[in-house]
Amino acid sequence: LFRSYRIVWNDGKVWHHRQVTDRKTPFTLKGGGTKMIPIARPRIVVGGGEVFYIFRDEERGSCVSIAHATDLAISQWTITDLTDFSVDAWEPSHDTELWKKQRKLHLFVQHTRQGDGERMAEIEPQMVYVLEMDMNTKK
C-alpha cells in the first residue's frame, strides 16, 4: 500500500528520507494492466539549496501542486496548489533547460484521463497550458 509522498537522498555519506505529504487514503497497484492511481509520479527540482516537489494528488482535488522546502534536513514543506481546476491523471513535466539556465519553472499542463486495467477513458480534446513560475522571485 502506498500512502504518502517521500523524498530519498544521499548526502555523500548516508541515505536520508523525509515525508513530503500526509495522504490519508491508501491505494495499491495490484491487478492487471495499467492502473489509474490517485497520485502522479512527482517531478523534483532542486536549486540553490531549495527543493521543489511538483505533484498531483486526488486528495487535493487532482490539481497541480508544489511542495517547497528550503532545507531538507528540517523537513518543513509548504504546499501550494498552482491550479484551481483538476488535471485528473496529469503527470508533471517541465522545461529542464529553462530551469538550469534561468531558474524558471515552466510546467506543461493538460487535463488527461487514464483508464483502469487497459480500458480507454473517454475525454474530449483538452487545452494545453504552460504554467510559468520564476523561482528567482521566490527567494
Write out the residue ranges for each language-model feature.
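Extracellular, repeat-based ectodomains that mediate carbohydrate processing or recognition
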Residues: 1-139
